[in-house]
Amino acid sequence: AKKHNLKLKVVSATSTNDVTSVLAGLTGKVSGLYLPTDNLMASAMKTIGQKAKTAKLPVVTGSIEMAEDGGTATYGINYYDLGKQTGKMAYDVLVNHKKPQSMAVETSKKLHLYVNKANAKSIGLATNQIKQP
């Protein structure tokens, strides 16, 4: 954040009912939102997306699905691809009888940039301004 001259403000919501009031408290005080992959945030994405759109705030999310549901963009894991990778590991254990403790820990092999073009346009962002790091 320092490198890009950004100030962070950390907030949380304990239920979907809290989301609207938390967002109202941020309006006019932040330039954008980052939402990690979280079940509560994912279930509130339609509300978050609509409130952020009204406030013209970009929303960077932790997953493609959250960006599709109201976020602006994400650079992260594609859970479908991760599921296929996990399936291959399970196959090695179940069919090839590999011992899990002998297998290397794996992380997602590829990160994906996803831009919700309709959302970006609605808040005044040109999609060519959004680039992967």
Stretches found by the model and what they are:
Residues 1-133:
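Short hydrophobic alpha-helices and adjacent helix-cap/hinge residues
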